[in-house]
Structure formats: structure tokens, C-alpha cells
Amino acid sequence: MNAPFHQLADAILAGTPATPEDALAVLRADDAELMSVVAAAGRLRRAHFGNTVKVNYLVNLKSGLCPENCNYCSQALGSDAPILKYSWLSKDETLKQTGAGLRGGASRVCLVSSGRGPSTRDIDKVTEMVVALKEEYPGVEVCACLGLLKDGQAQRLKDAGVDAYNHNINTAESNHDNIVQTHTYADRVDTVEKAKGGGLSPCSGLIAGLGETDEQLVEALFALRELGSDSIPVNFLMPFDGTPFENTWELSPTRCVKILAMARFVCPDKEIRIAGGREMHLRSLQSIALQVANSVFLGDYLTSEGQDAKADLEMIRDNGFVVLGSEEDLAQQAREPIDPAIRQRGAGTDVVPNA
């Protein structure tokens, strides 16, 4: 294995971190080199995570009507996207929604609410939900995503049983003001630091396709490495109608795979999660992306529908991976026979052919 990307993997496995120049080389690799990039990044993935895939499940506790003006977001101030809008779910409804995801194979549930950040009453609501969740499902990991944190709130969440806190930096600091003006990049970093200071595992990632340059994608990833993010969700812009980014299509499936591979090279021992937008941007390369990423969201997202959960589990199994924490049970569930479909169209019939 003398290809440059395998040499880079060798160096990283030996303890030499990737440089920004290395990251740019991965991102700018020719499409003809894609499988070499994937194979090299896959060595890092398997060295740290074996053949497991961590499955996460989102529960949108409060949807829409956010006062922040993030240009990419269907829930943001000024968005006309025709999404579901509702106030806080009840504790019982939260338990019901969480149970569905856990039965589907998720080991981590992500409790998300729209808004700038939680009030004291909001923290009260969420901590009550988390205590009930932990009692009902003792082994579940809980990640909260409630916006910008105030002093002491991370500790309250930790004390209630929250394991991690998600707050994405979304893009490079040099691109931040182009996508949101109601809070600063420093505000986002401060919340990640507050989460860490409160004993929560930091979960912070990015969104690709926001008009950023290659250099800004690299800048964002190295910022996440510097922040010490344990879990890095890599989202791909979903250009909702009614938002400033509607009709924005800057990504190809091969570029998305390279972005994920770049994340693996830069942060080899961190959870790299294929997050929002994977279905519309990776398309038929979703399974290839699993060779470098080790985590996915199951089912639907906050305001958009995702791939069928059964298809997600089949994709994991078909690629030789197992769901973290549910290796045996889910492997058997996914092994349902598929009978051949008898042709009833095209030649020899009056039915339009499949062409």
C-alpha cells in the first residue's frame, strides 16, 4: 500500500496528526482516487471502532418558531418552510418517541429543542424527562441539544443523567457571519466549553454546502479537533424551500464521501456521524460512506423525513457492520428473505417496460 493516502493513514496510525495540507489533499482528490481515499480512511475507522456502527435517534422536543436567523435552518426566524411547529412534548410523549428509536436499534437518543437557549424552566422540563428516560431505559445514552447554555445549566443536565451535549459550530469562524447574525461563533464555542466544564461529552459538528471554500471546511474540522469534540456530526445542507439557502446544491455524492473521509483523517479516533442530508446528497454512496464514518441517525430528522429505518439497518448489515450494543438481535431481525419479483411488464405484456 504505497498510495499517498495509505501513507497518510500509516503516519496517523503511528501517531502523527494530519495537517491542514493533508486534509486539503483528501478533499481535492480526483474522483478516480475515491476508493483509495475510502480504503485508507477505513483503516483508521476500523482501528478505532472495528466493524460497529453507533445508531442515534432524534426526538424534536419543540419544533419551529426559533428567534435565531440561521440561514440554513427550516425552524429559524424568517423561515417559510412548511414544517411542523409545536411547543414542548410532554414527558410521556417523549418516552414514547424515545422508545420507538431504541427498539429500532439506537443506543443514544438526542433530545433537541428549537430556540436560542434554555430557560431555567426549560432545564426543569428536560431534566425531568431525562430522569424518567433513565428509569425506563437504564442503558440509554442521552444527548441534549437545547441551544446556547448559561452558567450552571450543563451541570444540572449532567446531574439528571445527560451524557452528552450537542452544539454544532456548523461552519468555519471565517464563514460564520455569512450564515447567521443573531449570535456569534464565539457564542457557539462558549457553549461547547460550558458543556465540557459541566462534565458532558462534547458533540459538535458542521454543515457542508453552505457556500464555504475548501479551506473553510478544513478550518472548521481543525477547530473541532481543537475543541475536543468527542462526536462530530457531519451534516449536508438540506435546502428547504422558504429559507435563504433554498435551491442551493453545491454537493455531489463523491464530494460528501471525501468530506467524511477528511473528517476521519483529521479526527481518527472520534465518532464521525453521517448526519442530516445523507439521503439526498450521498444517495447511492451511503454504504460507501459507512466505510469511513462509524455513526448514523436512524429514521427521521428534526423537520424532514429520513430513509426508512429498516433500510438503514439493512445497509449496516449488508456492508459487514453491526449495530453497536445490539449485535446479535438486530443482525437476526435484518435477515429477512427477499423473494424474487416475477416480471409482469415489458416484453410479452401490454404494460410499459421498466426503462
UniProtKB/Swiss-Prot annotation:
Catalytic activity: (4R,5S)-dethiobiotin + (sulfur carrier)-SH + 2 reduced [2Fe-2S]-[ferredoxin] + 2 S-adenosyl-L-methionine = (sulfur carrier)-H + biotin + 2 5'-deoxyadenosine + 2 L-methionine + 2 oxidized [2Fe-2S]-[ferredoxin]
CDD domains, alphabetized: Radical_SAM (cd01335)
Cofactor(s) needed for function: [4Fe-4S] cluster; [2Fe-2S] cluster
Cofactor: how and how many bound: Binds 1 [4Fe-4S] cluster. The cluster is coordinated with 3 cysteines and an exchangeable S-adenosyl-L-methionine.
Residues in Radical SAM core domain copies: 51-275
Stated name of the protein: Biotin synthase
Keywords: 2Fe-2S, 4Fe-4S, Biotin biosynthesis, Iron, Iron-sulfur, Metal-binding, S-adenosyl-L-methionine, Transferase
Biological or metabolic pathway of the protein: Cofactor biosynthesis; biotin biosynthesis; biotin from 7,8-diaminononanoate: step 2/2
Function: Catalyzes the conversion of dethiobiotin (DTB) to biotin by the insertion of a sulfur atom into dethiobiotin via a radical-based mechanism.
GO molecular function: 2 iron, 2 sulfur cluster binding; 4 iron, 4 sulfur cluster binding; biotin synthase activity; iron ion binding
PANTHER family recorded: BIOTIN SYNTHASE, BIOTIN SYNTHASE, MITOCHONDRIAL
The gene coding this protein: bioB
Residue numbers binding [4Fe-4S] cluster: C66, C70, C73
Record-listed [2Fe-2S] cluster binding positions: C110, C143, C203, R273
Complex formation: Homodimer.
Organism: Saccharopolyspora erythraea (strain ATCC 11635 / DSM 40517 / JCM 4748 / NBRC 13426 / NCIMB 8594 / NRRL 2338)
Domain of life: Bacteria
Similarity comment: Belongs to the radical SAM superfamily. Biotin synthase family.
